[in-house]
């Protein structure tokens, strides 16, 4: 499976524990356990924003210690913020997905699309616009690689790179995050998922 950090369009540190659980479900994933995050950290996951885990703790994985992420002179590891109020405290979340039942693909389309056009284009192709969990699963489990930014269901734009190269995530294999653009701008393609 694969662990991925998640935050919504609202921006970082906006989810209480219950919203964090739901955010993962909405992306075809579940909230990650500590063991899953630890395994991901051992596999190289480095993320400088704290996120909820399934036990209600708030942690983040650091493989490259640096000043804003707990300090330069600290050892690599999973940093633990401890347990926080599940209703009032707000953080990001770490999600986990391992199920991959279907086909994930970049839709070949003659023009770039707005978000609404992207949703419709996948439907017209007998599919649905892909979720964040699906792009991470395709990238990690299938080695999916595409240097085209595409809309996803949550309104974010991302692209998966498993073979780093110039102009396409040159330093590391990653699902690159472009942002949450204005949904009315026709600047992107779309990733679809057919179950």
Regions found by a protein language model. Give the residues of each.
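Conserved hydrophobic ligand-interaction patch in extracellular adhesion modules
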Residues: 12, 17-44, 106-110, 115-146
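Beta-strand cores of modular interaction/reader domains in eukaryotic scaffold and signaling proteins
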Residues: 30-31, 94-96, 128-129, 191-193
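An exposed tryptophan-centered "aromatic clamp" motif
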Residues: 36-75, 79-85, 133-182
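Tyrosine-centered aromatic motifs in long, intrinsically disordered, low-complexity repeat arrays
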Residues: 60, 91-94, 159, 188
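C-terminal functional regions that serve as terminal interaction/effector modules
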Residues: 180-182, 189-190, 194
């Amino acid at each position: 499976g694969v662990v991925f950090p998640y935050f919504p369009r609202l921006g970082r540190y906006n989810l209480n524990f219950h919203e964090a659980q739901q955010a993962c479900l909405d992306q075809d994933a579940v909230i990650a356990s500590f063991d899953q995050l630890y395994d991901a950290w051992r596999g190289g996951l480095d993320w400088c924003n704290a996120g909820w885990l399934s036990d209600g703790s708030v942690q983040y994985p650091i493989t490259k210690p640096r000043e804003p992420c707990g300090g330069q002179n600290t050892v690599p590891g999973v940093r633990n913020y401890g347990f926080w109020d599940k209703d009032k405290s707000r953080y990001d979340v770490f999600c986990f997905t391992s199920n991959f039942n279907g086909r994930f693909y970049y839709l070949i389309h003659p023009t770039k699309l707005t978000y609404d056009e992207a949703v419709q284009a996948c439907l017209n192709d007998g599919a649905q616009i892909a979720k964040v969990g699906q792009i991470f699963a395709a990238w990690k489990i299938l080695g999916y690689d595409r240097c085209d930014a595409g809309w996803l269901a949550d309104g974010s734009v991302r692209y998966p790179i498993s073979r780093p190269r110039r102009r396409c995530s040159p330093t590391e294999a990653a699902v690159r995050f472009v942002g949450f653009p204005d949904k009315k701008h026709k600047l992107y393609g779309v990733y679809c998922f057919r179950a």
